């Protein structure tokens, strides 16, 4: 963890987008505090987590930095969160970067609009590595957004990326 600030400096210097996956931040105060420190650098290009993780971050930024242990899930797993679309939108506006909250329905917000992507599936949480793979796919697509930026918003572009991933998972 001590090297993340150096990594951020190098990423900014070389214009490399930073995709943050706050794995298990809803499960404990230490992980959440590290994620909040990363967000406060204003260097995050995209925040992607399950709905419980995104809610924990939103709550911590808005309710005295406390973790809602009722959403602890088991390990890095999360649960479907009520009002996740609203939380995703508000968090994207607050931290000024796109936010993705995954679950049975995925939500994407660029702080202007929220997109619902219905291709999430509960079985994906039972397969180890699907969240990590999604992070890699999002990073690859995110880094290729420039040619599309005049045709669609980043939120719409990321919603298409999630749809692509979800449909590929159905095969």
Where are these regions (language model features)?
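Glycine/charged-rich beta-loop-alpha catalytic/anionic-binding loops adjacent to active sites
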Residues: 111-124
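Conserved phosphate/ATP/ADP-binding segment of small-molecule kinases
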Residues: 32-114
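Conserved post-catalytic alpha-helical subdomain immediately downstream of the catalytic base
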Residues: 137-171
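Short, small-residue-enriched loops and turns at beta-alpha junctions
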Residues: 24-28, 107, 124
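Short glycine/threonine-rich catalytic loop with a Thr-x-Gly-x-Asp
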Residues: 121-138
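Glycine-rich anion/phosphate-binding loops
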Residues: 1-3, 148
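Glycine/small-residue-rich loop that forms an oxyanion/phosphate-binding "nest" at active or ligand-binding sites
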Residues: 3, 7-49
């Amino acid at each position: 963890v001590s090297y993340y600030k150096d990594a951020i400096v190098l990423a900014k210097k070389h214009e490399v987008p930073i995709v943050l996956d706050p794995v298990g931040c809803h499960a404990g105060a230490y992980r959440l505090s590290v994620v909040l420190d990363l967000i406060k650098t204003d260097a995050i290009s995209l925040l992607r987590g399950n709905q419980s993780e995104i809610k924990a971050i939103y709550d911590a930024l808005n309710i005295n930095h406390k973790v809602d242990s009722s959403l602890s899930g088991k390990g890095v797993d999360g649960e479907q969160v009520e009002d996740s679309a609203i939380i995703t939108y508000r968090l994207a506006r607050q931290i000024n970067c796109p936010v993705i909250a995954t679950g049975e329905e995925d939500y994407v917000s660029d702080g202007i609009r929220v997109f619902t992507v219905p291709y999430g599936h509960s079985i994906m949480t039972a397969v180890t590595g699907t969240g990590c793979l999604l992070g890699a796919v999002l990073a690859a697509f995110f880094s290729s957004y420039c040619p599309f930026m005049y045709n669609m918003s980043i939120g719409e572009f990321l919603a298409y990326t999630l749809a692509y991933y979800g449909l590929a998972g159905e095969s």
